[in-house]
Amino acid sequence: MIIIPARLASTRFPRKVLHPINGIPMIIHTAQRASQVDEVVIATDSEEVMKIAKQYGFDAVLTSKTHESGTDRVNEAATLLGLDAKEIIINVQADEPLIEPQVIKKVKELTIKHTKSCEIMLCSAYKKISFDATNDPNSVKVVLDASDKALYFSRSQIPYPRSDVKTINIHLGIYGYTKEMLQKFCTLPTAPLEQIEKLEQLRALYHGYRIAMVEVTSQSIGIDTPEDLKKINASFFE
């Protein structure tokens, strides 16, 4: 199952999940792409988002307004839906209207592969881009070990380029886990590194769990600010 967390009152871009792109709300673009891979449920704190989701034929559940992260919202939704402990859940960010179904599929396949692992808490994806294009702190960087497990995530440029570096790994905002591991993640204490970087995935690494990564090819960008919308080619939605 794919669960899309959708908070209406975004700090940097209020009501962004309902912002129209070619006349269709952003979250609906995301949901339509995700629905090519698996069943989609939208988890939101807004009756308005609930109504719009249903108008476009998507199931939605109403969750608390007090959640500090999308993962907490997904966790509540999974509980409300009564999902089994071993159910595979893919968390797709609402502000990824360009997310390719193939990216979601790869993360789902990786999550299934690690379902029985006690050390892999979650799975995610990354893409390689030019090192010169990584100054934006909203583009989260990830360094990996030899088996594509995450060593660290940062908003800074990592690794530091003491020598010539042509490409760097950019983390994509998608997560896969079992409901059991999702619940475990949400019960872990917030980590100091997580608070510094404002990256919740660092919580898993801090507490000794591992994050499995898969390389993908993707043109998707997360919409964090109104300026990000200018980067989107409207023809993608035609």
Swiss-Prot record:
InterPro entries: Cytidylyl_trans (IPR003329), KdsB (IPR004528), Nucleotide-diphossugar_trans (IPR029044)
Matches recorded under Pfam families: CTP_transf_3
Localization annotation: Cytoplasm
Annotated GO biological process: CMP-keto-3-deoxy-D-manno-octulosonic acid biosynthetic process; lipopolysaccharide biosynthetic process
GO cellular component terms given for this protein: cytosol
First-listed, main subcellular location of the protein, grouped into a coarse class: cytoplasm
Cytoplasm among keywords: yes
Enzyme class: transferase
Catalysed reaction equations from the record: 3-deoxy-alpha-D-manno-oct-2-ulosonate + CTP = CMP-3-deoxy-beta-D-manno-octulosonate + diphosphate
Keyword DNA repair: no
Pathway: Nucleotide-sugar biosynthesis; CMP-3-deoxy-D-manno-octulosonate biosynthesis; CMP-3-deoxy-D-manno-octulosonate from 3-deoxy-D-manno-octulosonate and CTP: step 1/1; Bacterial outer membrane biogenesis; lipopolysaccharide biosynthesis
Gene Ontology terms, MF aspect: 3-deoxy-manno-octulosonate cytidylyltransferase activity
CDD domains: CMP-KDO-Synthetase (cd02517)
Record's keyword terms, sorted: Cytoplasm, Lipopolysaccharide biosynthesis, Nucleotidyltransferase, Transferase
EC number of this enzyme: 2.7.7.38
Family recorded in the similarity comment: Belongs to the KdsB family.
Function summary: Activates KDO (a required 8-carbon sugar) for incorporation into bacterial lipopolysaccharide in Gram-negative bacteria.
Protein's recorded name: 3-deoxy-manno-octulosonate cytidylyltransferase
Taxonomic source organism: Nitratiruptor sp. (strain SB155-2)
